[in-house]
């Protein structure tokens, strides 16, 4: 097919719809030409009147229209085309026919394209709404959709600040958290008597609400010394209790309550051991 196309000259009387070349009539002299250019050579009858129909362009003009060939001297003018297509087609035709002045053409026709597009949009959709794309009839959907989105960022900072707000500081609780050294410092700075791990202290605030004081556990050093003393004697006398309280920087009441709790714990452990051995006779 390529060899046949290369040796056939361009611009003969016969048109092939699959390619842009023309075949001379001498090659096919015995066959009648198809797709004639004159409409009178192929009369056809229609069931409707053709006088009211708009004039249709020929096949040659439609096929060469997209290739930007200057056919003003051969073909009829396209004054009957729609206005929107004629404007855009002329702009693209000028750009393609003058490839060297592409930048100039874009700069010259920028305002023309802008105004023509706005005029076409105004004719098709009427007045454009606040969203810039849809008509004014869609403004109610635009406001309901994007109005909630715009109001959301104003609500989030309030929630974030409320969630990030620190809880009210409790009296004597700052020194109790942290390492063992900070706990020991708290015990030195608060010499008032307390009831150890199980003690609950209530401090009345300005609004009359009672809050529980945070528990201050014993340090490892204090527990080790108390366990050592408990190993020698389950019940501690007053002199030994005062000595331990001064050495461990605790109050007398704290040492006393610790021994009470430790005795209850030891009693529970003994009961659990007894139950374990009685339920397992093999041991």
Curated annotation (Swiss-Prot):
Residues 147-215 are annotated as: Disordered. GO terms for molecular function: DNA-binding transcription factor activity, RNA polymerase II-specific; RNA polymerase II cis-regulatory region sequence-specific DNA binding. Residues 177-187 have a biased composition (Basic and acidic residues). InterPro entries: DUF3528, HD, HD_metazoa, Homeobox_CS, Homeodomain-like_sf. CDD domains: homeodomain. Keywords: Developmental protein, DNA-binding, Homeobox, Nucleus, Transcription, Transcription regulation. Belongs to the Abd-B homeobox family. This is Homeobox protein Hox-A11b. It comes from Devario aequipinnatus.
């Amino acid at each position: 097919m390529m060899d046949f196309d290369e040796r056939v000259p361009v611009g003969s009387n016969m048109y092939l719809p699959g390619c842009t070349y023309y075949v001379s009539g001498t090659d096919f002299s015995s066959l009648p030409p198809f797709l004639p250019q004159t409409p009178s050579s192929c009369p056809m009858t229609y069931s409707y009147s053709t006088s009211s129909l708009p004039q249709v362009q020929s096949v040659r003009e439609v096929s060469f229209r997209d290739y930007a060939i200057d056919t003003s001297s051969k073909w009829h003018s396209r004054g009957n085309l729609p206005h929107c297509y004629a404007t855009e087609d002329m702009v693209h035709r000028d750009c393609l026919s003058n490839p060297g002045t592409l930048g100039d053409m874009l700069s010259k026709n920028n305002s023309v394209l802008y105004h023509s597009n706005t005029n076409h949009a105004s004719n098709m959709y009427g007045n454009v709404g606040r969203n810039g794309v849809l008509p004014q009839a869609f403004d109610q959907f635009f406001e309901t959709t994007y109005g909630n989105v715009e109001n959301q960022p104003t609500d989030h900072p309030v929630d974030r600040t409320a969630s990030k707000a620190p809880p009210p500081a409790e009296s004597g609780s700052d020194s109790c958290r942290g390492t063992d050294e900070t706990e020991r410092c708290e015990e030195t700075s608060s010499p008032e008597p307390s009831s150890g791990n199980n003690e609950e202290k209530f401090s009345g605030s300005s609004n009359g609400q009672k809050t529980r004081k945070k528990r201050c556990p014993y340090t490892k050093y204090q527990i080790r010394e108390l366990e050592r003393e408990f190993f020698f004697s389950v019940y501690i006398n007053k002199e030994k209790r005062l000595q331990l309280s001064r050495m461990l920087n605790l109050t007398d009441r704290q040492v006393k309550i610790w021994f009470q709790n430790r005795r209850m714990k030891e009693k529970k452990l003994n009961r659990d051991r007894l139950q374990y051995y009685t339920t397992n006779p093999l041991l």
